[in-house]
Amino acid sequence: MSGNQYTEEVMEGVNWLKKHAENEAFSFVFKCDNVQLNGKDVHWNNYTKPIQNEELTSLIRGAQTAMDQTEEEEMDWESEVDSLAKKQVQTFDALIKKCLFEVFVSKNIEPNECVWFIQHEWGKDQGWHCHVLLHSKNLQQATGKWLRRQMNMYWSRWLVTLCSVNLTPTEKIKLREIAEDSEWVTILTYRHKQTKKDYVKMVHFGNMIAYYFLTKKKIVHMTKESGYFLSTDSGWKFNFMKYQDRHTVSTLYTEQMKPETVETTVTTAQETKRGRIQTKKEVSIKCTLRDLVSKRVTSPEDWMMLQPDSYIEMMAQPGGENLLKNTLEICTLTLARTKTAFELILEKANNTKLTNFDLANSRTCQIFRMHGWNWIKVCHAIACVLNRQGGKRNTVLFHGPASTGKSIIAQAIAQAVGNVGCYNAANVNFPFNDCTNKNLIWIEEAGNFGQQVNQFKAICSGQTIRIDQKGKGSKQIEPTPVIMTTNENITIVRIGCEERPEHTQPIRDRMLNIKLVCKLPGDFGLVDKEEWPLICAWLVKHGYESTMANYTHHWGKVPEWDENWAEPKIQEGVNSPGCKDLETQAASNPQSQDHVLTPLTPDVVDLALEPWSTPDTPIAETANQQSNQLGVTHKDVQASPTWSEIEADLRAIFTSEQLEEDFRDDLD
């Protein structure tokens, strides 16, 4: 239907409701129960005593006019509802308005500054009652209970004044006490779940009228059904409106206030289970936590540098220090449970530098090359441990003399991981206080385990154990790889003055033994922070996955305590810029380990064929001198040939043409 088919009265009612749609209003209910005082029955319709009050008389006359004008054509309402009930409703309407005006005067509020709506209804169980909606900018939610008490007082006083039953002064006082104590005026409230107290609940003025009051039917049979008698409001929009027009206003208001597009929201199972509204503080903390995890923030210093705004925001809140600590603990816990140390290192690899990365010339591999080791094999074994694939051998042990590169390799690995916990030997009672929720445990300069040997063995083997923390309860350490450096023999455990050899083999079974003995030059420097990410990326690129199955595929067996890192030997050309494929030589094939023959140039051939120079001292004399120094007699020493004799014998066996032909064959 088009808007032109509706009456002006209907459209004005719709616009008035839309104007006050979102206004918050108090919702009061007035009632009048049947009571008995000393055998005298006082019913709800016994309050029609005439009174000489022009204002009250004028209000009653206005309510009477409104009821007469809204009667239906069939006159069913007139025939079913007796005149006494109609007169009582009109009187109650005047009394309620009188109570409102008296409250306005007590609060110094002008009546034209308030918006109100009154509807008298009849219920099967409750009988007569009246709903009152009241909105004013000068009335706050906290004043709701005070307003109820004031209206209840005025309401009881007017009821006693207009009671048509002949009551004594004592009975009148008793009637007023009953009205006030029984709360014949109530206000809409809700009960708080935590405090278990009742608080005033505000309603939307326009929505409440359109969706609730205007949809009710007009009362026809007081004993058979429920409905409304009369409606009045401060805007005079529904005082004289008929029943059909009221429904039309409600329908139009509902259609016009309906949102144009309905957003479809998907509620997850977790949100349904939570069943509560998240506060802005919770949402802010969750957003901050996601940012910290994505940026791999694991310390307060990293947080200050990478996310200073969120750090200051939390620090400024009440209990900010605890909030920062707990948020950071959740971040480290998330990284420890979802990522391995190898994965955290691999994330930091610069792929643009990987193309020209020379593994053999990296500082870490230079240290391994000094010992004649297969540096790829060593790096592959370390990567497996960092990825929690070493099984019981969950610890990388760098040991040996000072200045051999133990700490600089361990430090580079720890910096690349980031989320690292350090063992504190000075804290005798709580040495692993910093090692919970970490991706790597770093033990620098480990010494005698002593009475903590069992804890060490459990952590070094990757077991889940619980440890005590200072000022807190016990906390669980999940399987975490360990990197350890030491100058001592940690396999020897001393408790007091007694050695415990039974711990030696279990400790060896838990260690990836890397013994460094070659002292580094003073200008060797530190390992670059980008080196280990590139090493891990290089291993993955060339098929050396960080799993023990892949390790045994390449190197034949799992690493042991006395692992020979020099076998199989590796060619010096490996990983040179022009080398594409990696080739290793098996230790079981001795021929493959022979050095490549160096071609001889012609000048070298001529030098070999020239006559040898004769030493001043014969070999026999040198032998005699050495034998005399050792206390050996000349008889026991066999005479050695001179250089001239050796040269003559060689030339007698091989001619110059034969020697030159052999050298040419080698060159080919």
Curated annotation (Swiss-Prot):
GO CC term, one of those recorded: host cell nucleus
SUPFAM superfamilies: Origin of replication-binding domain, RBD-like (SSF55464), P-loop containing nucleoside triphosphate hydrolases (SSF52540)
InterPro entries: Helicase_SF3_DNA-vir, P-loop_NTPase, Parvovirus_NS1_C, Parvovirus_NS1_helicase, Parvovirus_NS1_N, PV_NS1-NUC
Molecular-function GO terms, alphabetical: ATP binding; ATP hydrolysis activity; DNA binding; endonuclease activity; helicase activity; metal ion binding
Residues in SF3 helicase domain copies: 367-529
Motif RCR-3, chain ranges: 212-216
Cross-referenced Gene3D superfamilies: 3.40.1310.20, P-loop containing nucleotide triphosphate hydrolases (3.40.50.300)
Residues annotated as binding a divalent metal cation: 121, 129, 131
Record-given protein name: Initiator protein NS1
Organism phylogeny: Viruses, Monodnaviria, Shotokuvirae, Cossaviricota, Quintoviricetes
Gene (name only): NS1
